[in-house]
Design a protein with these regions (language model features):
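Short helix-capping segments at alpha-helix termini
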Residues: 18-19, 137-139, 160-165, 234-235, ...
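Conserved AdoMet
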Residues: 27-105
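Mobile active-site "lid"/loop adjacent to the S-adenosyl-L-methionine
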Residues: 192-223
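C-terminal lobe and adjacent flexible extensions of AdoMet/dcAdoMet transferase-like proteins
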Residues: 277-292
Length: 292
């Protein structure tokens, strides 16, 4: 049996359970062979190891039941980097890359990528946001806060994996409570799903992502309220905050931001949905230098 035959069999086993069955199968087989998916076509005609078909079938069956590939493999690519996952962390999603790209664009325009900016990542999870930023900003320093000790451990592991551990620190905390410093950038992907909507999420999210990282309270805004209430204290003069929000939440978040003294613009995701709230103090201009 060839590698290509194993891959096709895995895709058939996943079937209609995933709209990306062929891609899922390719990722699974590549992982089992210890190569990247892009290299798999070069190995299609190889004779598959005896164990490959059985292992691929086992993982494909799990995928067919709704388990995400990233959960099975324990890692996920985000912004060109591979991040280790744990049960305490969300699987990083393309929507959140919109936040990273928005932050990088503002930094480049305002201070330049070599500036010694400081970054606070609230609800850091796997550390995907702050680690991705630090790999692009050679003189930046970052701190990540999360309510889960397991997530903090995973974030530190990812910082080490990508060579930025000497510029990143992580701690268990409740949003901004206990944060003493002020930061040029505050970034956050907080829980913003309404509690009553959790049960209606896709099975791969509902049953495999930590509810602590999903549940935003009755109206989905609990964490956003908490962040905005203390943002002025932790954001340096001239600083900018980037907060991921849910579909349909832009008007509410914009009103809350204004009530707390911030002007708010939005960056859309690839689907055209306002996904990232970009917040600056109403009284400030855009010419302040980095705090760090």
């Amino acid at each position: 049996m060839t590698v290509a035959a194993v891959r096709r069999a895995a895709a058939r086993r996943i079937g209609s359970a995933s709209p990306t069955a062929a891609l899922d199968a390719r990722i699974i087989v590549a992982h089992l062979l210890g190569c990247v998916p892009e290299q798999l076509p070069l190995r299609d005609e190889e004779e598959a190891p005896a164990s490959l078909a059985l292992e691929a079938e086992t993982l494909a069956a799990r995928r067919a039941k709704g388990e995400p590939v990233a959960r099975m493999l324990g890692e996920k690519e985000f912004h060109g980097l591979t991040f280790v996952l744990s049960p305490d962390t969300l699987v990083p999603r393309p929507d959140t890359e919109t936040l990273v790209d928005a932050a990088l664009a503002v930094i480049e325009e305002r201070w330049g990528r070599d500036a010694p900016v400081t970054i606070l990542d609230l609800g850091t999870g796997s550390g995907a946001i702050v680690v991705a930023l630090l790999t692009e900003l050679p003189n930046a320093r970052g701190a990540g806060i999360d309510a889960s000790a397991g997530a903090v451990k995973t974030a530190a592991e990812n910082a080490a994996r990508h060579g930025v551990a000497d510029r990143a620190g992580f701690a268990v905390g409740d949003w901004t409570r206990g944060v003493r410093d002020r930061f040029d950038l505050v970034v956050a992907n907080p829980p913003y799903v309404e509690s009553g909507a959790i049960a209606g999420l896709p099975v791969e999210v509902r049953e495999h992502d930590p509810h602590l990282a999903l549940d935003g309270g009755a109206d989905g805004m609990d964490a956003i309220h908490a962040i905005l209430a203390d943002l002025d204290r932790v954001l340096a003069e001239g600083g900018v905050a980037f907060v991921e929000i849910g579909a349909g939440q832009a008007a509410i978040v914009g009103g809350l931001a204004e009530a707390h003294g911030f002007r708010c613009t939005f960056r859309p995701d690839l689907a055209g949905i306002d996904r990232v709230a970009v917040l600056r103090r109403q009284r400030e201009t855009d010419d302040n230098g980095p705090h760090g």
